[in-house]
Amino acid sequence: MENQLKTHVRVLVIGGGVVGVSTLYHLTKKGWTDVALIERTELTAGSTWHAAGLLPLFNMSYTVGQLHKYSVDLYKRLPAETGQDVSFHVSGNLRLATCRERMDEYQKYCGTANTIGVPFEVISPKRVKELWPLMELGGSPQTPAIIGALYHPDDGHIAPADLTMALRKGARAAGAEIYEHTEATAFERTISGEWLVRTGKGDITAEHLVLATGNYARQTGRLLGLNVPAIPVEHQYIVYDESPELKAYRQGGGRELAVLRESDQSYYLREERMGWILGPYEKGAPARFADGVPDWFGRSLFPGDLDRL
């Protein structure tokens, strides 16, 4: 049974996706236990439900790279801390290169990775084939030859919903409150400088607000008189049924293949059961829901439109 809505907290997080719940969890780790989160429908509905769960350690920024490394380390220890599996597949990640400029970028990254402490290898085509034996290395007019890659052995993919539930469990164990089916309908600034948040289940006053509403950021911003310049775009991905080649490889004792990324052709590929998920980063993806994301889209998909890829 859900607890009765508190009337006052130090921090109120709006939005129950992985970002909002992670914020709540980390507030408790900093000793801020008088905190709460409200979610208009159910946890993970929205951006988290639609996410592919990729965990790219690669980043040329020292600051962002540290954040990525911290996240991967957190996912490894969360199950022991909370008792909740996060479905973290440490399959590794291969970022392919088909041109010298891409290999130069990977060489430049070495300094950042070494400073942060991220394990990596800049590898040859032969090593790529060893790690990904189902791959054809190319070399035709239609398929550029692979000249090398950047390999992160600690990378992989995760189930965003499972991760959210683990963070939820950790936050609640530390004293945080979570209220689902509780939509923020209005915000008012009080004389004391605090925030009065009106919901369908009553009002709650907070010293601080954290807005983590993802696709709904524009709508939340309007309630505060803000124009949030964030509009969702339609992204297509392809889920392949069982692959005979992959099935034979895995049943023959092969380990889970690393997540593939190809920056020049702009796509990722990873295993999904005995099939594949292919996600092309299409150019000119159409904007959607500029006036607001409808209620029904929390766990829905766009119709297929592969012709524009």
Annotate each PLM feature.
Residues 6-8, 86-95, 109, 129-174, ...:
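Helix-loop-beta segment of a Rossmann-like dinucleotide-binding subdomain
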